Design a protein with these regions (language model features):
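ATP/Mg2+-dependent ligation/transfer catalytic cores
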Residues: 1-208, 232, 401-461
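Catalytic-core signal marking the mid-to-C-terminal active-site face
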Residues: 2-5, 18, 238, 245-246, ...
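Short glycine/proline-enriched loop/turn "hinge" motifs that connect secondary-structure elements
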Residues: 99-106, 144, 211-215, 264, ...
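Short, hydrophobic beta-strand segments
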Residues: 110-116, 220-226, 273, 359
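Core alpha/beta catalytic barrel or barrel-like domain that forms the active/cofactor pocket
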Residues: 145-153, 169-184, 204-223, 254-270, ...
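Short beta-strand elements
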Residues: 163-172, 269-277, 334-336, 343-349
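Accessory "access/gating" subregions that flank catalytic or transport cores
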Residues: 181, 186-190, 194-208, 222-229, ...
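Active-site neighborhood of thiol-dependent amide/isopeptide-bond enzymes
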Residues: 226-238, 261-262
Length: 461
C-alpha cells in the first residue's frame, strides 16, 4: 500500500469515528480549532452536517496566513507567506474531540492538524512542529514524557488596558491584599470557580491534579499528570481556554500573561521532562541503582547550550522578559542544580523511575506546543551531540553572571534566527516565519507610548 493510500484509509477511519461520536452525543455544532503561533485557538464553527460534509469532501480549510498573524490578529511582515498561497486543509484529530462543557446546547470542539493538498503536514503549524521533534526521539527508540506546572493570575475585570489590574474579590467580598503562598483559605476564596475548572477539565479529559496558591496575589498553580508530550500539549492548550471561560462565569478574568502585575512574581509554565526507552519504558535518565546516566547529563547540557537560542518559543513576548528577574522565583540563566529553585534547570529529588529535569524558564504565556517542542528539542540535541553539562550549581544562581538568558525579545529572536541546529530541527521556513512574527510584534509594540513615558518625560525633558 502506498503512503498516499494509507493516508486516505486513515482519514476515512477517523471520519467515521468522529461521525459516530457526534451522533452519539447529539451534537449540533462543531468548533474546529487550530492553535496559531501564539497558542490562540483559531478556526471555524460549523453545524454538524456542514462539518461532516466538509470533512468527507476535504473542504474544511484555513488560509496558511493564520500562522503569520501576530498576537494582535494583524498579519506580520514576512516573505515566508505569499498572497497566492493555497489554503491548508484542516484534519480533525479524532482523539481530541470533546463536548464543550460551558455551552448550554451540545457543542463539540476538536483540535485540527493542518495539511497541504498533497497530504503532507504544514511546515509551520505549531502542533506539527512538536510532532516533528517527537519523531526524532522515536527514530532513536526514545520516548519523552512531560508534565507541565502552569501558573496564572485571577484579576478583577478591567476594561481599560491603560489601568493596572486589581485582584478580584472572593467569597468574603474582599480582594487579597498580600501574598499567600500555599494558603489553603486563600484558594478557598475562589472555590466556586475552581469547582467549575475541575468539572470542565473532567468533561474534557484534561488530566490535572494539584491546585496551590502561588506566591503572587491571587496567583494559583495547577499541575498536569505526566504523559505523552503531544497529548499533554493538547490538554494544556484546551486548559488555558477552559480556565478563562470558567473565570468569566464568575465575572472575573484569568490571565496567563507572564507578568500582569508590576510588583508581583510572574507566571511560569515549568516543564518536567524525562526520556524512557520506547520498548521497555525504563527511564533513561537513571540507572536502576539511581545513578545519573550520561544521557541524563547530556540532556541537561543540551538545554544549557540551546535554550538561549530557543527563547522566543518559551518567552515569546516583550512582557515575557519582565518575569525573568532576580529574586522573584524566575530564572535568569541556564545553571542547573539539585532542588535549587534559583537555577533555570532544577533536578528534583526522586527515585530512579522518576528521574527528571524541571525546565523553569518557559512562561505561562508560551504556546504549549512550541514550548514543549523547544524544551525537548534542546535536550535531544544534547543527547545526540553527546554534550557535557557544567558543574551543578550549589549556591545562589542569581549571583552568577554566567550562562545568562537573553534579556529582550529582539536579542532572543536574533539568536533563534541564527541557530543552524534549531533550523535543522524545526525547518527553515518555520524559524524564518516565527522570527518575522516576533519582529513584527515588537515593531507594533514600539508604536505605543507607555504611561511611564507620559508620566516622566512629558514635562521633565
Amino acid at each position: 500500500m502506498s503512503r498516499k493510500e494509507s493516508r486516505k484509509d486513515k482519514h476515512r477511519d477517523e471520519t467515521e469515528t468522529i461521525a459516530d461520536w457526534l451522533k452519539e452525543h447529539r451534537v449540533g455544532e462543531v468548533e474546529c480549532v487550530v492553535p496559531d503561533m501564539a497558542g490562540i485557538p483559531r478556526g471555524k464553527i460549523l453545524p454538524t452536517t456542514k462539518f461532516l460534509s466538509g470533512l468527507r469532501q476535504g473542504t474544511l480549510r484555513l488560509p496558511e496566513s493564520i500562522f503569520g498573524q501576530m498576537v494582535t490578529g494583524v498579519d506580520a511582515e514576512t516573505e515566508m507567506l505569499t498572497y497566492q498561497a493555497p489554503d491548508l486543509i484542516m484534519a480533525p484529530v479524532a482523539s481530541t474531540i470533546r463536548i464543550v462543557p460551558w455551552y448550554k446546547d451540545p457543542t463539540a470542539q476538536v483540535i485540527c492538524d493542518c495539511v497541504n493538498f498533497d497530504g503532507t503536514p504544514s511546515e509551520v503549524a505549531p502542533r506539527e512542529i512538536l510532532k516533528r521533534v517527537l519523531k526524532l526521539y522515536e527514530e532513536r527508540g526514545w520516548k519523552p514524557v512531560v508534565a507541565p506546572e502552569l501558573e496564572f493570575y485571577l484579576a478583577a475585570k478591567n476594561l481599560d488596558p491603560d489601568y493596572p489590574l486589581q485582584p478580584p474579590a472572593g467569597k468574603t467580598g474582599r480582594p487579597q491584599t498580600g501574598r499567600q503562598a500555599y494558603g489553603i483559605d486563600a484558594v478557598n476564596e475562589f472555590d466556586p470557580l475552581f469547582e467549575d475548572v475541575y468539572d470542565f477539565c473532567e468533561a474534557q479529559d484534561i488530566g490535572i491534579d494539584s491546585l496551590i496558591h502561588e506566591e503572587g496575589v491571587a496567583q494559583v498553580e495547577m499541575n498536569f499528570n505526566h504523559g505523552d508530550p503531544l497529548a499533554i500539549a493538547d490538554q494544556t492548550f484546551l486548559f488555558k481556554r477552559t480556565v478563562r471561560q470558567a473565570a468569566l462565569r464568575h465575572d472575573i478574568y484569568a490571565t496567563f500573561m507572564a507578568k500582569p502585575y508590576e510588583a508581583e512574581p510572574g507566571s511560569a509554565m515549568h516543564i518536567h521532562q524525562s526520556v524512557v526507552d520506547a520498548v521497555t519504558g525504563e527511564n533513561l535518565f537513571a540507572t536502576r541503582s539511581g545513578k545519573d546516566t550520561k544521557l541524563f547529563l547530556a540532556h541537561i547540557a543540551g538545554l544549557q547550550k540551546h535554550l538561549p537560542a530557543a527563547m522566543p518559543l518559551i518567552a515569546p513576548f516583550v512582557n515575557s522578559y519582565r518575569r525573568l528577574v532576580r529574586f522573584l522565583s524566575a530564572p535568569i540563566n541556564t545553571h542547573w542544580g539539585h532542588e535549587n529553585r534559583t537555577v533555570g534547570l532544577r533536578v528534583p529529588i526522586s527515585d530512579a523511575k522518576n528521574r527528571r529535569i524541571e525546565n523553569r524558564v518557559p512562561g505561562a504565556d508560551a504556546n504549549p506546543y512550541l514550548a514543549i517542542a523547544a524544551s525537548l528539542a534542546c535536550g535531544y540535541l544534547g543527547m545526540v551531540q553527546e554534550l557535557a553539562p557544567t558543574k551543578a550549581m550549589e549556591g545562589n544562581a542569581y549571583e552568577s553572571s554566567r550562562y545568562q538568558l537573553p534579556r529582550h525579545i529582539l536579542d532572543a529572536t536574533a539568536k533563534f534566527r541564527a541557530s543552524s541546529d534549531l533550523k535543522e530541527l524545526f525547518g527553515e521556513k518555520f524559524v524564518a516565519l516565527y522570527s518575522d512574527v516576533k519582529s513584527s510584534e515588537h515593531d507594533a509594540y514600539q508604536q505605543v507610548i507607555s504611561p511611564w513615558e507620559r508620566q516622566h518625560l512629558l514635562l521633565n525633558v
